[in-house]
Amino acid sequence: MDKSKIRNFSIIAHIDHGKSTLADRILELTNTVEKREMQDQLLDSMDIERERGITIKLNSVQLKYHSKDDKDYIFNLIDTPGHVDFTYEVSRSLAACEGAILVVDASQGVEAQTLANVYLAIDSNLEIIPVINKIDLPSADVDKVKQEIEEIIGLDCSNAPLISAKTGLNVQDVLQAIVDKIPPPSDAIDNAPLKALIFDSYYDKYLGVVMSIRLKQGMLKVGDKIKLMSTNAEYEVTSLGIKTPKIVKKDFLEAGEVGWVAASIKTIKDVNVGDTITSVLNPAKEPLDGYKKLKPMVYCGIYPIDTNKYQDFKEALEKIELSDSSLVYEPETSQALGFGFRCGFLGLLHMEVIQERLEREYNLELIATAPSVVYKVHLTNKQVIELDNPALLPEAQKISKIEEPFVEIKIATPSEYIGDLMNLCQNKLGIYKNMEVIDNNRRILIYQMPLAEIIFDFFNKLKSISKGYASFEYELIGYKESKLVRMDIKLNGEMVDAFSMIVNQKFAYQRGSALTLKLKELIPRQNFEVPVQATIGNKVISRETIKAYRKDVTWKLHAADKSRRKKLLEKQKEGKKKMKEIGTVEVPQEAFVAILKIDD
């Protein structure tokens, strides 16, 4: 194969700027997909992706393009997720490319996520082609957006294609720019030791785990014995090929190509995105750069509302895990919610998507506890434990300090909302770092803050303050010591484990008061008085009381019969006291949902 005719590229964009629509037009113009098979967001395979207008799962497709100079080229388009939760996947798919198309909405301009992905592309030394989309919108301001891209990102936009991916206007110019500007694979040597980058994987019921790969050097044939360099596990290649987007089998793949390989691998957990495949007979000395093992950032307990559905829930998680190796879970029991699972996710969007898939694809009704991050707890005996479940935090006297994950957050916003957004960040314990100017009307705010403050309700508040115009992205910068305490909720003197949370000391009273008040509203009245207490250790920081129903036991007495009246009331009082000692309080479903919204 003539390597000078190969172009490997990704499309990067902020959510809703038209990435998947441009991919659709490229597939149409290169006759990769017949008109009758075409549907919107073709590469987005999940219903949730189409509905939310986001890309979650990576996809790659090989296209053939006949250029203006009458030559045939092979394009490998590697689709990328655009959301902050999937940053590592984006970085690995960019590592499989030589170039990237940067799509910017002509009416919206440069957004926070655009910048995040562009910086990843720059780190990977990719040739970046800016493309300005949606030029047919009445609100489009092409000159302003060109200026933004040049000033903020530093890309020359004098020859940037101006397109409408929806109508197909000028998309042909993008295809020609790919040929002219993106270099062919430079380091692709067929006779060197095999090195192939795994940039995605999924489970197929016939083939087992299928790995999406970019061959950096060497060749790969059916029957070859291969080794995954991060685990040293060895397998034999059973089939390989390319996607067009249909699965097409081939006998071999050469250096520079993008394709797929299957090797009878049973579970997706055995394959790590970013790992290097090499040959058992002639192994490479060093793996490719950039591999890291993905660790969940956000945890929560998920329980089926109908306890009889526990087995169905377990099977549903097992099936989802086949296509999503970043999901982790382990069984968990709660006195309040029964049997469920503690699940770990890459971030909030990942958590929402998994929950939605469980409910929609497997017909389950679920309830989730408040999300939590992974804390590093330093004990007085010099031991350090990592903990994601607030209910398991040791007693205060055994702890010397607690560290929590901090992130650097970048918020792109119209200038008019800056004051309110700075207040929001300060209320979330944000530390101001910098403010960058995009243009006369837009700024980028840079803060550092605890991840725990972002996962609660930061996104909703940011959107409501800015009327939907602000966008943000964040990256983990490490762990820092914080003054954290465990807050428990007691109903009728009994602790409800599902309500436990780790909070900053500064917010403990405020959150405790808000939660006890909310629970007082939501928990139905009983035949006995129920105290609702927020506690830290043995100290009660907030209390509300749910008043008891009172039955009128004296209704049939004569008004003058005072001693009889007193006797009946005493008897009622004794009965209530006994009931209070043995009575349990039913906590309605809404109360568990309320805990997620106590900051509102």
Swiss-Prot record:
Subcellular location: Cell membrane
Main localisation: membrane
Gene3D superfamilies referenced in this protein's UniProt entry, alphabetically: 3.30.70.240, Elongation factor 4, C-terminal domain (3.30.70.2570), Elongation Factor G (Translational Gtpase), domain 3 (3.30.70.870), P-loop containing nucleotide triphosphate hydrolases (3.40.50.300), Translation factors (2.40.30.10)
Its membrane topology: Peripheral membrane protein
S-S bonds: none
A biological-process GO annotation: positive regulation of translation
GO CC term (a single one): plasma membrane
Annotated InterPro entries: EF-4 (IPR006297), EFG_III/V (IPR035647), EFG_V-like (IPR000640), EFTu-like_2 (IPR004161), G_TR_CS (IPR031157), LepA_C_sf (IPR038363), LepA_CTD (IPR013842), LepA_IV (IPR035654)
UniProt keyword annotations, A-Z: Cell membrane, GTP-binding, Hydrolase, Membrane, Nucleotide-binding, Protein biosynthesis
Residues noted as binding GTP in the record, renumbered to the chain: D16, H17, G18, K19, S20, T21, N133, K134, I135, D136
Catalytic activity, reaction form: GTP + H2O = GDP + phosphate + H(+)
EC number: 3.6.5.n1
Pfam families with a match to the protein in the record: EFG_C, GTP_EFTU, GTP_EFTU_D2, LepA_C
Residue ranges occupied by any tr-type G domain in the UniProt entry: 4-186
HAMAP family per the UniProt record, alphabetical: LepA (MF_00071)
Protein purpose: Required for accurate and efficient protein synthesis under certain stress conditions. May act as a fidelity factor of the translation reaction, by catalyzing a one-codon backward translocation of tRNAs on improperly translocated ribosomes. Back-translocation proceeds from a post-translocation (POST) complex to a pre-translocation (PRE) complex, thus giving elongation factor G a second chance to translocate the tRNAs correctly. Binds to ribosomes in a GTP-dependent manner.
Name of the featured protein: Elongation factor 4
Species whose genome carries this gene: Mycoplasma capricolum subsp. capricolum (strain California kid / ATCC 27343 / NCTC 10154)
Gene name as annotated: lepA
